[in-house]
A protein has these predicted regions:
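Family-specific functional microsites
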Residues: 1-162
């Protein structure tokens, strides 16, 4: 399983993991080493950010805090990429169907856009609660800004994709 998901040198795996890493916008939370343990335990991963604050005496202090949006995005990228790696491998070995790099990229983008669309729909039409809308925005905004230089503030209500 470890070989299939992480260390297989087939271009499908390297292409998928490269796209996931490329989408990751958080410099402060470095991209993890991909291993079977990372994939299986992705739900337990936590991304911490360092913020500078002033102490009671006015001196600058660095404080680490849990970044819920970045954590959620990383969990989505790891789990969706691993699942897609598995399904494309099954197609390659069982159905004997090779995928080109453009097909792999398009399939991966379709998967991530589907997740983004599900989040937007849930936030704006199903739950409609400020905390969930904020979570969705915190999850996707930095990644979308990496792709769209003029991302509108109300992107959650628009047809924005990767």
């Amino acid at each position: 399983m470890d070989h299939i998901l992480t260390s297989c040198p087939h271009p499908t795996n390297t292409t998928l993991w490269d796209h996931a890493k490329e989408l990751w916008p958080h410099e402060e939370g470095t991209w993890p080493d991909i291993s079977l343990g990372t994939i299986i335990g992705c739900n337990a991963i936590s991304v911490e950010t360092t913020k500078e604050t002033k102490g009671r005496d006015g001196t600058p202090q660095k404080r680490k805090s849990h970044d819920q949006g970045a954590t959620r995005l990383l969990q989505i990228l790891l789990s969706e990429t691993a699942y897609l790696s598995w399904t494309l491998r099954c197609e390659r070995t069982i159905r004997e169907r090779e995928h080109t790099e453009p097909e792999i990229r398009a399939t991966w983008l379709k998967t991530i856009n589907r997740r983004l669309s599900e989040d937007k729909t849930t936030a704006t039409k199903v739950l409609r609660r400020k905390p969930y809308t904020s979570l969705v925005k915190n999850t996707w905004t930095k990644a979308l800004q990496k792709r769209h230089s003029n991302l509108p503030d109300d992107w959650i209500n628009r047809n924005v994709v990767f």
